[in-house]
Amino acid sequence: MDEDIQQEVQNLRDLIHKHEGTTARYLTERRRALNRLNKLGLPWPMIGREIGITTQTAMRWAGKWSRLRR
């Protein structure tokens, strides 16, 4: 894995672990970090595996998969 990608993965792990700041800011930072990783070329299943969540959860957190609201 590329050094840039490893650094981004570590930053995302730290962000999720700390969960500091307001909820809205945390969600925005988490979404941006996930999308940055995907833009660097890491596929969604691998992103999920690296941070310990499912592919669907990673995509939902990144805003790529919205839940149905009824």
Question: Predicted regions span which residues?
Answer:
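DNA major-groove recognition helix of helix-turn-helix
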Residues: 30, 38, 51, 62-66
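Short coil/turn linker and secondary-structure boundary residues
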Residues: 3-7, 42, 53
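Short, solvent-exposed alpha-helical "recognition" segments
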Residues: 44, 59-70
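N-terminal acidic leader/helix
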Residues: 1-22
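Key DNA-contact positions within bacterial/archaeal DNA-binding proteins
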Residues: 56
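Short, amphipathic alpha-helical "recognition" segments used to contact nucleic acids or chromatin
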Residues: 25-42
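Short alpha-helical "recognition helix" segments of helix-turn-helix
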Residues: 47-49
